[in-house]
Design a protein with these regions (language model features):
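Conserved, well-structured functional cores that handle cations and Mg-NTP chemistry
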Residues: 1-61, 66-68
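Residue-level signal for helical boundary/lining positions with a hydrophobic bias
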Residues: 47, 176-177
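An anionic, glycine-rich sequence signature occurring as long contiguous blocks
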Residues: 71-176
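Conserved, mostly hydrophobic/aromatic
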Residues: 180
């Protein structure tokens, strides 16, 4: 397990933590985060971008207790917060719309606030939803073809990050993949 600092032009590995035999990944993650807080301090960064694997109330509360906000990619359509955000944003105008030049995508964003995540979490959250569209050009049999593509992303944010604009949540959510892509 690792922690990295992701910026548009720079990715820095901050720390590593092994997952012990018979140990839950979240336990190793909290050990890593506790050490990072001691080494770097609480103000080294404002928030963590967390994998969907950690969408659990107790884990997210532990991150907040360490002094950080969080955002997590929301993938599980069966979750009530996912369904509620989808229903509340349907038919609404986006709160922001732009062309993401680096990713070559057109991006409208919706921001749904004051949602209930889980009883065990106990605080409201917001969900930023993007519907990205782009044209992919391929050469097949010597001929250029253009294919329209679309993808939807949702990020859940803690209340501490409520004041950040939705485009920032979008950028931070996609920077999470800085090393892997």
């Amino acid at each position: 397990m690792f922690a990295q600092l992701n910026e548009p032009k720079l990715n820095v590995l901050l720390d590593l933590e092994p997952i012990r035999p018979e140990e839950a990944e979240a336990t190793a993650a909290l050990r890593l985060l506790g050490r990072m807080r001691r080494v770097y301090g609480v103000r080294f960064f404002d928030a963590l971008t967390i994998d969907a694997w950690y969408v659990q109330g107790p884990f997210l509360k532990a991150v907040e207790k360490l002094g950080w906000g969080w955002k997590v990619v929301l993938k599980q359509e069966r979750m009530e917060v996912f369904q509620e955000a989808r229903q509340l944003s349907a038919g609404q105008k986006p709160v922001a719309e732009f062309d993401a030049a680096r990713r070559q995508r057109h991006v409208p964003l919706w921001d749904v606030k004051d949602l209930t995540f889980t009883e065990s979490y106990g605080h409201t959250v917001s969900v930023v939803h993007s519907h990205e569209t782009w044209t992919e050009t391929k050469v097949l049999g010597g001929k250029k073809t253009h294919q329209q593509n679309a993808s939807d992303w949702r990020w859940m944010l803690c209340d501490q990050l409520k004041g950040y604009p939705p485009p920032m949540a979008y950028e931070a959510g996609h920077r999470r993949w800085g090393i892997e892509n």
